[in-house]
A protein has these predicted regions:
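N-terminal positively charged helical leader segments and presequences
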Residues: 1-72, 123
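Structural motif
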Residues: 6, 18, 40, 62-64, ...
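Gly/Ser/Thr-rich beta-alpha loop segments that engage phosphate groups in nucleotides
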Residues: 40, 91, 193-197, 218, ...
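RNA substrate-binding interface of SAM-dependent RNA methyltransferases
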Residues: 70-165
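Active-site/ligand-binding-proximal alpha/beta "capping" segment
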Residues: 157, 163-203, 209-214
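Structured adenosyl-cofactor binding patch, chiefly the S-adenosyl-L-methionine
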Residues: 198-241
Length: 241
């Protein structure tokens, strides 16, 4: 039977290995999809590739599966980070979901002077990332970190990484120009509703780790800028090329 569901699990996956599914997954399989024992599912954990598995238990007491064969080997993750200022409503959730679909490895919220949303539900955001990975077919789930100050990624002690700063004001190069030297590690930085303050822009532009980039002739909403920037990076430098 062709698998109808793809699930992210935290446990190791190997031939004939049993896998216990969490209570949410068990409920979904049993009561929403109504899958019987023996039904096929696909499992992945971000380390061991993707596996075809058969359900050996599904019901009120939970769900378990056993791995039958590997369907895809694990592939390297594009070393791309997203640094973004959280936004109001459910748009932060959407940013996490779409960034996952667009292939980022790590999602790092940053707090700017104009950031309105300063407390995040990390459990929910990590769940959104896992669900997006299940749906889009990727073999990994990006890490979602707690929010840090805007200037934390510029700390000399931090891992060196080229940061493309989506600058809505002032002179800035294209994404293709910024990535012409093919850096090993890249991050996209997008701002809050209302944009960065002049002081923040000045500090960012002064850093040797930062290259200001423009995302076209129109002013974009904070979430739209994130999607546009990641798309340009992936098509120019990332795993779309």
């Amino acid at each position: 039977m062709k698998p109808s569901q793809r699930l992210y699990v935290a446990t190791a996956l190997d031939q004939d290995g049993p896998v216990a599914l969490d209570t949410g997954q068990a409920h979904y399989l049993a009561h929403v999809l109504r899958l019987p024992v023996g039904a096929a599912v696909l499992l992945f954990n971000g380390r061991d590739g993707e596996w075809l598995a058969h359900l050996t238990q599904v019901g009120k007491k939970g769900a378990e599966a056993v791995c039958v064969e590997q369907t895809r080997a694990q592939t390297p993750v594009c070393d791309l980070d997203l640094l973004f200022a959280p936004v109001k409503g459910d748009r932060t959730d959407t940013i996490v979901e779409k960034a996952t679909e667009l292939g980022v490895a790590r999602i790092r919220p940053v707090l700017t002077e104009r950031t309105i949303v300063r407390k995040l539900n990390l459990e929910r955001l990590r769940s959104r990332a896992a669900e997006a990975s299940e749906q889009c077919g990727t073999l990994f789930v990006p890490e979602v970190f707690d929010a840090v100050s805007l200037m934390s990624p510029l700390d000399p002690k931090a891992e060196p990484r080229l940061i493309l700063f989506a600058d809505e004001a002032g002179d800035a190069m294209s994404v293709a120009e910024a990535l012409a030297d093919k850096p090993a590690r890249v991050a996209l930085l997008t701002g809050p509703e209302g944009g960065f303050t002049p002081a923040e822009r000045e500090k960012l532009r002064a850093s040797p780790l930062v290259r200001p980039v423009n995302l076209g002739p129109r002013i974009l909403r904070a979430d739209t800028a994130t999607f546009a920037g990641l798309t340009l990076i992936q098509s120019t430098w990332g795993d779309w090329t």
